[in-house]
Amino acid sequence: MMELLKLNIVTPQGSIFSGDVKSVTLPGAEGEFGVLPGHADLLSLLNAGAIEFEKSNGKTELVAVNWGQVKVDAVSVDVLADGAIAIGGDSESEVAMAIANARTLLEEATDNNVAISSVVSRIESAAKNSL
């Protein structure tokens, strides 16, 4: 049986994602880091960026976050974000709206234009692959 992590991404407005995933990549304050099942316990601040995760069905999804905290243990990853936008939708217009909202969220969180461009480019690339 495949090992999975329970991922929860929550904002003050409610849950953004809750489900089983194979892996998670997070924009940590000290740099991007990945989490697999069995990871050591960890607490970290999150910078503005994208959380990328592979769902149990193999599909990769992204969530843009402005900042937050993450608690990792061997079986779960709990993200508490100030703001987050799930990148996805059933149509190109929904995906374009999510990308625009993510860009706004990131621009409000940081004035580092290089970081914003990098994250938005990654989000756009992933969104194109999901349609």
UniProtKB/Swiss-Prot annotation:
Protein keywords: ATP synthesis, Cell inner membrane, Cell membrane, CF(1), Hydrogen ion transport, Ion transport, Membrane, Transport
One cellular component (GO) term of this entry: plasma membrane
TM region(s), chain numbering: none
SUPFAM superfamilies: Epsilon subunit of F1F0-ATP synthase N-terminal domain
Gene Ontology MF term list: ATP binding; proton-transporting ATP synthase activity, rotational mechanism
Cellular compartment(s): Cell inner membrane
Listed CDD domains: F1-ATPase_delta
Family named by the database record: Belongs to the ATPase epsilon chain family.
Function according to Swiss-Prot or TrEMBL: Produces ATP from ADP in the presence of a proton gradient across the membrane.
Subunit structure: F-type ATPases have 2 components, CF(1) - the catalytic core - and CF(0) - the membrane proton channel. CF(1) has five subunits: alpha(3), beta(3), gamma(1), delta(1), epsilon(1). CF(0) has three main subunits: a, b and c.
Protein name: ATP synthase epsilon chain
Organism: Wolinella succinogenes (strain ATCC 29543 / DSM 1740 / CCUG 13145 / JCM 31913 / LMG 7466 / NCTC 11488 / FDC 602W) (Vibrio succinogenes)
